[in-house]
Amino acid sequence: MMNRVILVGRLTKDPDLRYTPNGVAVATFTLAVNRAFANQQGEREADFINCVIWRKQAENVANYLKKGSLAGVDGRLQTRNYEGQDGKRVYVTEVLAESVQFLEPRNGGGEQRGSFNQQPSGAGFGNQGSNPFGQSSNSGNQGNSGFTKNDDPFSNVGQPIDISDDDLPF
């Protein structure tokens, strides 16, 4: 038999990190996963999947993911039950995550709190100051660099980006 779940989605809120009485870390979070098809109004609906992860990975999830972070979860489906406060049996189905992949840079979601892959400023470009294209700031577009002002993909930096609400899963 096979019980395997692979999900990619965005966290609906910050992960909840707790510790068992024995000191084992456990984090819970909910992942919003877009469905592959649109409804009759042309909108893509999302499923909200509860996930649980244990030990060091739970601490990493709590430290490095936050609401809106894009994550990949690999795990298995589990159902557990307990007796609620009203005496009735409560059943919970959730994904027991074996691994969680962080699928975007730390600063990609807005707030910057560091990154696993963060490189020193100017890495890969030598000591060129703030101009990553290797030209001095006052040299203009000399020679045959092949890079004109109209080709600059970052020329609109600082201006709002036009993103439809339909493109956001939350």
From Swiss-Prot:
Keywords: DNA damage, DNA recombination, DNA repair, DNA replication, DNA-binding. Plays an important role in DNA replication, recombination and repair. Binds to ssDNA and to an array of partner proteins to recruit them to their sites of action during DNA metabolism. GO terms for molecular function: enzyme activator activity; single-stranded DNA binding. A motif (Important for interaction with partner proteins) lies at residues 165-170. Residues 2-104 form the SSB domain. GO terms for cellular component: nucleoid. GO terms for biological process: DNA recombination; DNA repair; DNA replication. The gene is ssb. HAMAP family: SSB. Coiled coil: none annotated. SUPFAM superfamilies: Nucleic acid-binding proteins. This is Single-stranded DNA-binding protein.
